[in-house]
Amino acid sequence: MLIHQRTLQNEISLTGIGLHTGHECTITFKPAPVNTGYIFVRTDINDCPEIPALIDHVVDVLRGTTIGIGDVKVHTTEHVLAALYGLQIDNCRIELSGPEPPVLDGSSNPFAEALLSAGIAEQDEPKNYLVIDETIEFHNPEKSVDIVALPLDGFRMTVMVDYKNPALGSQHSGLFDLDKEFLREFSPCRTFCFLSEVEAMANQGIIKGADIDNAIVIVDKQLDETEVQTLADKVGVDASHLVLGQNGILNNRELRFSNEPARHKLLDLLGDLALLGMPVKAQILAXRPGHASNVEFVKQLKKYADRNKLARQYQHEKKAGVIFDINAIQNILPHRYPFLLIDKIVEFKLDEKIVSIKNVTMNEPFFQGHFPGNPIMPGVLIIEAMAQTGGIMMLNGKENIKESVVFFMGIDKARFRKPVLPGDTLVIEAVMTNMRRTVCQFDAKAYVRGELVCEASLMATVMEKKN
């Protein structure tokens, strides 16, 4: 894979109609400095507001991915972003004279060809790859969607679609080399829908810019003349221009590839993956993906990336099975011996869950008085260990971590199930249940040899230290 970041040599523009809004728009791709990423700019609005193409800015996923900040939005970003991501361009300023990029032929190819004609320039800064070193999974059982990222020193993507619709059936496609395959094998693949969906989408106020030249319509139902006329009126075309066809595609249009729908789903996933803000080294397997599931999957990748960033910041020596060792913990928490009551963090999902380990030894100072001849770890110190575990989850991500401290506001439903003795290993799991600004609630449980020994619900807040 490429080493250095890339941008454009020159700017280039394209003009056309937006797929869903139907508004005419000119899109202009411009070079951008290193570490800029992709930034959409609405030049048709006063002050030309900018919207970075990042997953946190996704506001809608109805038949496309829409990003926005406040009232300013950019619709259907996926084909543009797929072209940039597929050509491995890292930094680009994307100016729009309307709310939606032009659909053109319904694929990414016109954008990709335009970007190549503008020229690609290598930059001095190295690419910031997200390297996947563990399995990351997204599942939606209700929609039978599964997307998985696996460790790989490179990039591959495989997509399977199965609409349980005899007009399309099951298809799959795989991309194994961006350099060799993206431009010719995937960028030309057009957006598609089923004939049975067209009227409903028109009633939703979308596909205003769609026509038979920029979308594949798969015929999955037969229509009589009256129904054809009704459909034509809905989508604003002449009924004489609609032919159900003999090949299963409206107007007998030919597919560019036998599995073009599956390839287009892969293209959409590439475009949504670009919202991560960095290229990925991984093998990605996706069954029945769509924009909603793509976005949720990328959110999981972002949490993984944020966690890794924090781990690199505090954990200077990589250790198998350890996210933060005792040295990293002391860089995060202000506690010190004898009141630092956790030894390492072994699992960490940002803003979701954290698991710590506390090795309980006879050398603990509290065993001298609790109790002589019958040493038992005080329950309040188990609660404190839970609190410190949750505190790490709360403090991570704070830029001024050295100037922050966690204060506890409440302890509820505390239960002590079994005594903790010298030689035991406490495994403490804290799961965030609510986060509002600086106040966090989480449920904590402590285990010894797989048995629950203590549990409690805790509430805490992050505040700045007072001098």
From Swiss-Prot:
Region entry 3-hydroxyacyl-[acyl-carrier-protein] dehydratase, spans: 307-467
InterPro entries in the record: FabA_FabZ, FabZ, HotDog_dom_sf, Ribosomal_Su5_D2-typ_SF, UDP-acyl_GlcNac_deAcase, UDP-acyl_GlcNac_deAcase_C, UDP-acyl_N-AcGlcN_deAcase_N
Keyword Metal-binding: yes
Gene Ontology cellular-component annotations: cytoplasm; membrane
Catalytic activity: a UDP-3-O-[(3R)-3-hydroxyacyl]-N-acetyl-alpha-D-glucosamine + H2O = a UDP-3-O-[(3R)-3-hydroxyacyl]-alpha-D-glucosamine + acetate; a (3R)-hydroxyacyl-[ACP] = a (2E)-enoyl-[ACP] + H2O
EC number: 3.5.1.108, 4.2.1.59
Cofactor: Zn(2+)
Pathway linked to the protein: Glycolipid biosynthesis; lipid IV(A) biosynthesis; lipid IV(A) from (3R)-3-hydroxytetradecanoyl-[acyl-carrier-protein] and UDP-N-acetyl-alpha-D-glucosamine: step 2/6
CDD domains hit by this protein: FabZ
Region (UDP-3-O-acyl-N-acetylglucosamine deacetylase): 1-306
Binding locations of Zn(2+): H79, H264, D268
Keywords on record: Cytoplasm, Hydrolase, Lipid A biosynthesis, Lipid biosynthesis, Lipid metabolism, Lyase, Metal-binding, Multifunctional enzyme, Zinc
Major subcellular site: cytoplasm
Full protein name: Bifunctional enzyme LpxC/FabZ
Source organism (scientific name): Chlorobaculum tepidum (strain ATCC 49652 / DSM 12025 / NBRC 103806 / TLS)
Gene: lpxC/fabZ
